[in-house]
Every structure is written in structure tokens, then in C-alpha cells.
Amino acid sequence: EKFAAKIFGADETYFVTNGTSTSNKIVFHSCVTPGDIVLIDRNCHKSIMHSIIMTGAIPIYLTPSRNSLGIIGPIHEEEFDWAEIEKKINSSSLVSDKENFRIKLAVVTNSTYDGLCYNTRKIIDRLEGVVDYVLFDEAWYAYANFHPMYVGRYGMSPEIDRERAPTVFTTHSTHKLLAAFSQGSMIHVKDGKKKIDHGRFNEAYMMHMSTSPQYAIIASLDVSSKMMAGNSGRFLIDETIQEAIVFRKKMKHLSEEIEDKEVDRKRRWWFEIWQPAQITMENEKGERKREDIEDIDEQLLKEHPEYWCLKGNEDWHGFGKLESDYILLDPIKVTVMTPGITKQGRMRNWGIPATIVTTFLRDRGIVVEKSGHYSFLILFSLGLTKGKSGTLLAELFTFKKLFDENAPLDDVFPDIVKKHPKKYGRMTLQELSEQMHEYLRKARIARVLKDVYSQAPEQVMLPARAYSELVNGNTELVRIRELQNRISAVMVVPYPPGIPVIMPGERYTPETKRIIEYLNFSEDFDNRFPGFENEMHGLKVKLDSNNKKRYYTYCRSEEHTSELQSRSDL
């Protein structure tokens, strides 16, 4: 652990053998007590909500941005300003004493699922004097310390003012993108003004750790640290970034080649990469010019992080005004866009929903990390060879060939057709894409999703109280179409997009009716297109008398809801 702390730039490091879900809970239990206020990235992992429930904390949410393509963006800098935080606290019904309160901890997911990396120095500086501790949940970002691309963009990176800055935690799923065994995780600590008493921290650590740990996991964490020490870590990450950049450039080149050479207009389509089309470069004389990304040397793209920084109000990212150097797009996290929607969120007349492509890839052994309605994420990791990225390109070409030739679905998805012969037995790939795209277009899915996250639900009770109601049987399963004015007892997370639409203790209200609309849409979609269902956390699926899927979720029983009158009941 001491060696790992040195390698990862921490004061102290702790090895954890039950994943970063447990690491997050350890951090919470080390510094948060019942009634403490915590600032929470709404784009958080479910383990953060579990931690809030376990500690009895009061969550105040930081809202991430979102573009018209449905991609989850960063929390804008002003969300971290004291004036904005104070406004949210004053409007929260869960904070009874608006004058005397403590904000113990702020939690930020870094990087986002689509590879947006924060300038952590800017966040730490803004939270100076506001919170005691900052936790960067970097489950998918443990490699950042080992390449200049990410300097200043991970929790342990910036040098902080030890007398004024908050103490910083980062949690890493070392098993995800480094070389540890499954469930291997690390907690890194960099002390600020309110230093961690490591004797007390150890009590929280032992609360969640087994007295009979799997020592192979611990050994693998040690090996992972050793692998990244010295120049080897830089070499491994450099190689990964190189492969990702080459893939990005190939995809762009292929798109242009198909557009130029394909005679049949209907076949002039390819997948787009979510990235800037051009980058502003500066020569030795200080002269600036715009270059197409596919024309820039890979070495330059690796050596200049500023080329990957999002500029304010640029059309390609769609997140509005961003401060210079605040957000960097991680080259190794590649978001692929399928045809069907413009950058402004306008649905085209034809398209190929991403779930069709990702199901095709999955059946051929290619793992897609995350899928939206018209996008999916490909993750380049250590050891990814040219052969593997070449296989991905080959399978995308195979899909295009099958689509252009309008192949029968039986040739594309034989298992799905076998399971649902009445639905798909005589259908072709183009017909499936047309039906699904038209359904999404008529549902105005891009607009609905944007509205879902534009208005935060009303907080009615503490998440810990909502969970107690669940345990005590004071809840009931409610059909999603009947959710109006009900208080949720669970966190509901639809995939796509992967952000909770409602948290435990929040109420479904007329102001947030789009949430219910989206859940109803998802239920209907799953019944219309079996085999391509959405993934839903927090919902229970039942079959009705017609063998149709019906969504239910746990809400506080109405008889108990009527008793909710005072702060003491929260």
C-alpha cells in the first residue's frame, strides 16, 4: 500500500477487495455522519446512493449537463460556486436549519462514462472553504497518473494548499483498466486542511472489509502497482492512446471515403466518432490554423492534451459555455454515433438505432461499454492490440454490408428470431431499423430525455428514511403509469442514458411528468422490440395476462405517505 501510494501520488493508499462500491462506502463512513450535508454528482454510481443511505446523509445534487445527442456532459463550474450551493440548500426541505449546517463531502464522477475528464484543480479550488472532503469516483480512470495527457485531471494530480484545501479521496477500480483481479480496488488519500486520522479511518475500513480476504486479489493490486511503476506505466498508456487515436482517424477517413466513392446514395453512410472535426494548432511562429483531426500526426495528438479540450459553445459537443481547460475528452474512450440524429438533436428521416448495432457486436464477442439510442462507447484498454481494433472495424463493415444488402434478420440475429418468430420471422435488417427509428422519432426521444433531466424531482424524505420504509414493508409496487405524486423508495436508473431519473425519497410530480413519460416509453419499447430491451435498475418487470411486460417500482405506501407531516418523520 505504501508503494502504491507513491506510484499513484497519494499520501496514503488502501487496498480493497470488494470493488469500488465498497471503497466508496468506506470513504463515506470515515467522514460522514447522520444529518451531514453531502454534495452529490447526479451522475453517480448506485454505490454512492447506498453510502448516503447507510450514513443518513442529506444529499444536495450537482446537475451534469446533457447534449441533444443524449450524451452525459460535465457539471458546469458555476454549480460548485457557494452562491449556487447555498441556493440549493435553502430550497431543500430536508435541511431544517438553514443557518447552521455542515457540508462534509462533495462527490464527483471523474471521468464521465463518455470520457469527459475534469480539471480537478478548478473543482478543488472552488470547494475550498465549502466542504471538508472531496471524493473523485474514478472507477474507470485508474490509469490517469501514468501519462502527461491527464496531468491536472485526476484527484491525486494537483498539488493542493495543505492548509486551506479540502482533503481529497479518489477511488479506483484497479481491476477495470489496470491489471488487478476482479473486485480489486484502491482508495487514495491526499490530506488537506482537515486531515484524515488514519486510526479512525481504519475503523471505517474494517467495517466493510472481510477478516478473511482473498489474498490473490490483494496480491494482484500489488502487482498492478509494480507494473505501472517507472517508464512501463507511461509506455502501456501511451500504447493504448496510440491505438485509440489510430482507430478514431481510420473511422473518420472511412466516412469520407464512403461518401466520395459510393455510387448508391442510400449506401453513403458510415458511423461517426463523437469528437471535434477540426483542431486549432499553433506553429513555432505563433500562427494558428484549423486542421482536420485525421490529418494530424498521432504523435502530436498524444503530446498535446489541449487538442482534446472542449472549447466553449462548440457545436460538436453541445454542452454550451465551458471555461477554457475545464474539460478534456479522453482519447481512449471512443463514442461512436449511428445514423439517425443530428448534433442539434433533430431526428433524421432514416436511422439505425444503436441497440441494433451493439446487439450485433455483442453476438460477435465485442464488448460495448455503454449504449445510448444513437451512440455507443468503445473502451480502449491496456493490451488492446491492432488485431482487436481491426476486428471491431471488420465487424462494423460486416454490419454495413448486411444492412446495405437488406439481409433477413434470420441471418443477422438468428437467436432473437428463433425466440420471437412471429415478430421477426419475415423481417429484414432495414425493416427492423426503419420500424425502430420511426418509433423513436415519433416519440421525440431526444427531446423527452432532455426534459427528463432539466427539472430535479422534489425531495420529500431522506434516502435513509425511504430505505427504512422499504425494509419495514411500508412500500408497495406501483405501475409506472400510476406514479404521479408517489414517493419513490428506490433509485431508478434507465440505460440509456445511465443517470438516475429519481432517487429514494423523491416524489414524482407534475413538474417532472417527463420521467413517467420516459418510463412508459421504455415499457412500450420493450414490448414492441423484444430482444432489444432497455436495461432498467430499480424497476420490477411482471407479465400480464397477455404476456406483455409491465414495469413496477417500489413507492411509499399511500397510507404511510399521508402520515408524512413533519421534519421528525423524515
Which ranges hold each PLM region?
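Conserved PLP-enzyme active-site core in the AAT-like
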Residues: 7, 18, 23-33, 39-255
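Non-catalytic terminal extensions of PLP-dependent enzymes
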Residues: 1-2, 6, 231-558, 562, ...
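General small-molecule cofactor/ligand-binding pocket signal
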Residues: 14, 60-62, 369
